[in-house]
Amino acid sequence: TFVPPSWRFHLGHSYYLLGRYGEAVALFREAIERAPKFRPSRMYLVCAFAEMGQIEDARDAAKSLLEAWPNFTSGSAVKFFPIRREEDKNRIIDSLSKAGLPKT
Protein backbone atom coordinates (compact mmCIF):
# COMPACT_ATOMS: atom_id res chain seq x y z
CA THR A 1 0.00 0.00 0.00
CA PHE A 2 1.05 3.59 -0.63
CA VAL A 3 1.51 5.72 2.47
CA PRO A 4 2.48 9.33 1.70
CA PRO A 5 5.17 10.92 3.87
CA SER A 6 2.72 13.62 4.94
CA TRP A 7 0.96 11.23 7.32
CA ARG A 8 3.53 12.13 9.95
CA PHE A 9 2.53 15.77 9.79
CA HIS A 10 -1.19 14.98 9.93
CA LEU A 11 -0.84 12.61 12.87
CA GLY A 12 1.45 15.10 14.63
CA HIS A 13 -1.11 17.84 14.02
CA SER A 14 -3.82 15.67 15.57
CA TYR A 15 -1.63 14.98 18.60
CA TYR A 16 -0.90 18.70 18.91
CA LEU A 17 -4.60 19.56 18.93
CA LEU A 18 -5.20 16.86 21.56
CA GLY A 19 -2.45 18.30 23.77
CA ARG A 20 -0.17 15.29 23.28
CA TYR A 21 2.80 17.52 22.56
CA GLY A 22 5.64 15.05 23.09
CA GLU A 23 4.19 12.67 20.52
CA ALA A 24 3.56 15.60 18.19
CA VAL A 25 7.19 16.75 18.45
CA ALA A 26 8.50 13.31 17.47
CA LEU A 27 6.24 13.19 14.41
CA PHE A 28 6.97 16.76 13.32
CA ARG A 29 10.70 16.03 13.52
CA GLU A 30 10.25 12.95 11.32
CA ALA A 31 8.08 14.94 8.91
CA ILE A 32 10.76 17.65 8.63
CA GLU A 33 13.43 15.04 8.03
CA ARG A 34 11.42 13.47 5.21
CA ALA A 35 10.02 16.69 3.70
CA PRO A 36 12.23 19.62 4.81
CA LYS A 37 10.49 22.15 2.56
CA PHE A 38 7.04 21.51 4.07
CA ARG A 39 6.80 24.55 6.34
CA PRO A 40 3.72 23.63 8.42
CA SER A 41 5.71 20.87 10.14
CA ARG A 42 8.24 23.46 11.25
CA MET A 43 5.56 25.84 12.51
CA TYR A 44 3.79 23.21 14.57
CA LEU A 45 7.10 21.96 15.97
CA VAL A 46 7.65 25.46 17.37
CA CYS A 47 4.15 25.44 18.85
CA ALA A 48 4.49 22.00 20.43
CA PHE A 49 7.79 22.87 22.10
CA ALA A 50 6.31 26.13 23.42
CA GLU A 51 3.24 24.34 24.78
CA MET A 52 5.52 21.90 26.64
CA GLY A 53 7.38 24.85 28.18
CA GLN A 54 10.57 24.01 26.31
CA ILE A 55 11.15 27.59 25.26
CA GLU A 56 14.79 27.18 24.18
CA ASP A 57 13.81 24.31 21.90
CA ALA A 58 10.89 26.40 20.63
CA ARG A 59 13.25 29.30 19.87
CA ASP A 60 15.68 26.99 18.06
CA ALA A 61 12.80 25.57 16.02
CA ALA A 62 11.62 29.14 15.32
CA LYS A 63 15.05 30.01 13.90
CA SER A 64 14.81 26.99 11.61
CA LEU A 65 11.30 28.06 10.58
CA LEU A 66 12.54 31.56 9.74
CA GLU A 67 15.34 30.11 7.62
CA ALA A 68 12.73 28.21 5.61
CA TRP A 69 10.20 31.08 5.66
CA PRO A 70 12.02 34.39 6.27
CA ASN A 71 8.96 36.64 6.58
CA PHE A 72 6.92 34.33 8.81
CA THR A 73 4.77 35.86 11.55
CA SER A 74 2.00 34.40 13.67
CA GLY A 75 -0.31 36.30 11.34
CA SER A 76 1.04 34.11 8.55
CA ALA A 77 -0.14 31.06 10.46
CA VAL A 78 -3.74 32.18 10.58
CA LYS A 79 -3.61 33.50 7.02
CA PHE A 80 -2.10 30.48 5.26
CA PHE A 81 -3.34 27.56 7.36
CA PRO A 82 -7.02 26.79 7.86
CA ILE A 83 -7.50 27.06 11.61
CA ARG A 84 -11.21 27.07 12.29
CA ARG A 85 -11.59 27.16 16.04
CA GLU A 86 -10.80 30.49 17.65
CA GLU A 87 -9.25 28.79 20.69
CA ASP A 88 -6.84 26.89 18.42
CA LYS A 89 -5.89 30.10 16.61
CA ASN A 90 -5.18 31.81 19.91
CA ARG A 91 -3.15 28.86 21.22
CA ILE A 92 -1.02 28.83 18.05
CA ILE A 93 -0.46 32.60 18.11
CA ASP A 94 0.47 32.46 21.82
CA SER A 95 2.85 29.54 21.24
CA LEU A 96 4.58 31.29 18.36
CA SER A 97 4.91 34.45 20.46
CA LYS A 98 6.48 32.46 23.33
CA ALA A 99 9.12 31.32 20.84
CA GLY A 100 9.89 34.94 19.97
CA LEU A 101 8.18 35.11 16.59
CA PRO A 102 6.51 38.42 15.71
CA LYS A 103 2.72 38.70 15.59
CA THR A 104 2.57 40.74 12.40
Where are these regions (language model features)?
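Alpha-helical protein-protein interaction modules
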Residues: 1-104
